[in-house]
């Protein structure tokens, strides 16, 4: 639970439970991976239609097994930007993304958020789980401090495994501060972020498209 998956998933479960209580909903999962962490919640509060998108074919194959039994599942081997851009206007009730958006550049994130705002139905919700930088924290400082946190806290990981994970972070992670995400959301017509919880750099938040 080094990335607070248990705590964050409980928050996501509550958000989806609240949405399911309002009636049938369509969910788009950006960067779904193998869908393992979300599968139980989706079985508890099944969407009328689930679309999961990821670039990893093996992960999607595993997701198909994890999501077996849901009413309608569509899995796509596609990047997040093109997937959201292909959605019709006002067509999705919930857009969910977990630990995926930070791989995009700032400009790509801004374009993605605009497309999210376009694709959501009025009163639709974007649930974002991701790493974030502290206000005023540079990316270099974030990467260094994340490595320090792993070295200090990831007791069950061998040093060479920590170095491997850190190498991936140093090369591919480009997290934003919450204020930057808020500015992108405003530009897309979304509400200010409702931060459900933050555990170090790991955060869960929701945005909504006003009615």
PLM segments and residue spans:
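Conserved alpha-helix/loop element of class I SAM-dependent methyltransferases that forms part
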Residues: 4-23
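Conserved class I S-adenosyl-L-methionine
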Residues: 23-33
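Class I SAM-dependent methyltransferase SAM/SAH-binding core
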Residues: 28, 36-83
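A conserved beta-strand element that flanks and buttresses the S-adenosyl-L-methionine
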Residues: 96
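Short catalytic micro-motifs in class I SAM-dependent methyltransferases
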Residues: 99-100
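A short glycine-rich, Lys/Arg-flanked "PGG" loop and its adjoining helix->strand segment in the class I
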Residues: 110-122
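C-terminal alpha-helical "lid/dimerization" subdomain adjacent to the S-adenosyl-L-methionine
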Residues: 129-187
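Core SAM-dependent methyltransferase catalytic element
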Residues: 191-211
């Amino acid at each position: 639970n080094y990335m607070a998956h248990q705590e964050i998933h409980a928050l996501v479960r509550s958000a989806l439970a609240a949405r399911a209580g309002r009636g049938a909903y369509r969910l788009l999962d950006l960067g779904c991976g193998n869908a393992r962490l979300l599968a139980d919640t989706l079985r508890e509060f099944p969407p009328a239609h689930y679309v999961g998108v990821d670039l990893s074919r093996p992960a999607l194959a595993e997701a198909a097994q994890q999501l077996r039994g849901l009413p309608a599942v569509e899995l796509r081997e596609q990047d997040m930007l093109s997937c959201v851009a292909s959605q019709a206007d006002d067509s999705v009730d919930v857009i969910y993304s977990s630990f995926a958006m930070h791989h995009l550049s700032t400009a790509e994130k801004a374009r993605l958020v605009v497309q999210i705002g376009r694709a959501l139905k009025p009163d639709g919700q974007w649930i974002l789980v991701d790493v974030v930088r502290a206000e005023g924290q540079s990316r270099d400082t974030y990467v260094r401090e994340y490595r320090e946190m792993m070295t200090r806290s990831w007791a069950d990981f061998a040093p060479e495994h920590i170095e491997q994970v850190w190498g991936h972070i140093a090369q591919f992670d480009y997290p934003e501060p919450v204020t930057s995400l808020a500015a992108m959301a405003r530009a897309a017509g979304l509400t200010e972020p409702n931060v459900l919880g933050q555990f170090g750099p790991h955060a869960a938040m929701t945005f909504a498209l006003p009615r």
